[in-house]
Amino acid sequence: MLTQNELKYYSALLQKKYRQQEQKFIVEGKRLVEEALKSNYKCEVVIMSEFYAKKDHSTVEKFSKHLRTEIITEDNFKKIAETKAPQGIAAVVSIPSSPIKISKDEKLI
């Protein structure tokens, strides 16, 4: 179960400042969540609304086997969603750090 502090933390990620500071972002929608999980991004948690969880049991089972999965109320889900009509599923994903590569021939000014 998500605590109120976690809910506030995830809703803060809607602001660019906090996404950059925490090196995390939220993806919304089943397709985007699945794409993020297929990539090399590290998923912290998958969050679903109660309505979505009741509607799509197979997705709940699929994600809960391998990841922390939380089911929250519709009102709480709207706090972490950026869209006006959220689908009911989102994931908190870490931004991978990529070192800057400079070839020996290039110069930094």
Question: Model segments located where?
Answer:
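RNA substrate-binding interface of SAM-dependent RNA methyltransferases
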Residues: E34, K38, D75, I102-I109
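Glycine-rich nucleotide phosphate-binding loop and flanking beta-alpha elements
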Residues: V33, K54, K78, S97-P99
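Short loop/helix-cap segments at secondary-structure boundaries that form the rim of catalytic
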Residues: S58-S64, I100-S103
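Boundary-proximal intrinsically disordered activation/regulatory segments immediately upstream
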Residues: M1-H57, E61
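Structural motif
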Residues: K24, E44-V46, R68-E70, Q87-A91, ...
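Short gly/ser/thr-rich secondary-structure transition/capping motifs
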Residues: Y10, E28, I72, V93-P96
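Glycine/small-residue-rich loop that forms an oxyanion/phosphate-binding "nest" at active or ligand-binding sites
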Residues: E61-S94
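Glycine-/acidic-rich phosphate or pyrophosphate-binding loops and their flanking alpha/beta elements
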Residues: V92-D105
